[in-house]
Amino acid sequence: MTDRYEQINDYIEALLKPRPDNVKRLEAYAEEHHVPIMEKAGMEVLLQILSVKQPKKILEIGTAIGYSAIRMALELPSAEIYTIERNEKRHEEAVNNIKEFQLDDRIHVFYGDALELADAVHVTAPYDVIFIDAAKGQYQNFFHLYEPMLSPDGVIITDNVLFKGLVAEDYSKIEPKRRRRLVAKIDEYNHWLMNHPDYQTAIIPVGDGLAISKKKR
């Protein structure tokens, strides 16, 4: 992440209202155990968008330990959230965390690879919001697979589309090569998304970058 980009995020995070202790405990656990969760500033923007949109049903691709799903459920008391996690340990942690927050009646966790669960997830479609926050190299595949399950006025939100600001730099020399390929994949996804014939997209440079995509009328 570039110094300037990081400074801006730090500034925004310093302005945020304190979060409940149980939420801060999740954040501390994620940091200690290197679990990727949304950056705080990006999370607040996501919640603001959801509070305006007031979705009744949300699909999240990439549960991790349940942090984002829990934050969304707390913000939207009447929303149902369906979320997918392929890592067995994180799936178990997410289920336990959701129960601790007493949200297991509204947050439903699928275990498995999102690329293989479309049929199961389709049963509870359509979704008013689809939130993509899983394997970055598969973003375009996730979009293709789940976009048909979006409600007519729904939005698709993708996290990490700026990837520490690296997509805006000359990433041809990034090492290791695996990281370079991942940055290239995200850059490719951004260009594809911005030129999608059926969606209009805005990219918001907050957190690690959010793309907000809505069907064209």
From Swiss-Prot:
Residues the record lists as binding Mg(2+): D133, D159, N160
What happens biologically when this protein's gene is inactivated, per the record?
A: Deletion mutant does not contain mo5U.
Which enzyme class? transferase
UniProt keyword annotation of S-adenosyl-L-methionine present: yes
- EC number(s): the record gives 2.1.1.-
Q: Which Gene3D superfamilies match?
A: Vaccinia Virus protein VP39
Q: Indicate the segments annotated as coiled coil, or none if absent.
A: none
Q: Which residues bind S-adenosyl-L-methionine?
A: M38, S68, E85, D113, A114, D133
Q: Which GO terms describe its molecular function?
A: magnesium ion binding; O-methyltransferase activity; tRNA (uridine) methyltransferase activity
Keywords associated with the record: Magnesium, Metal-binding, Methyltransferase, S-adenosyl-L-methionine, Transferase, tRNA processing
* Gene Ontology biological process terms, A to Z: tRNA methylation
Pfam families annotated for this entry?
A: Methyltransf_3
Please list the reactions this protein catalyses: 5-hydroxyuridine(34) in tRNA + S-adenosyl-L-methionine = 5-methoxyuridine(34) in tRNA + S-adenosyl-L-homocysteine + H(+)
In terms of HAMAP family, this protein maps to: TrmR_methyltr (MF_02217)
Q: How does it assemble?
A: Homodimer.
The further comment given in this record reads: Binds magnesium, but the ion is dispensable for mo5U forming activity.
Q: What does this protein do?
A: Catalyzes the methylation of 5-hydroxyuridine (ho5U) to form 5-methoxyuridine (mo5U) at position 34 in tRNAs.
Into which family does the record put it? Answer: Belongs to the class I-like SAM-binding methyltransferase superfamily. Cation-dependent O-methyltransferase family.
Q: Which PANTHER family match?
A: CAFFEOYL-COA O-METHYLTRANSFERASE 3-RELATED (PTHR10509:SF14), O-METHYLTRANSFERASE-RELATED (PTHR10509)
* Name this protein carries in UniProt: tRNA 5-hydroxyuridine methyltransferase
Q: Which organism is it from?
A: Bacillus subtilis (strain 168)
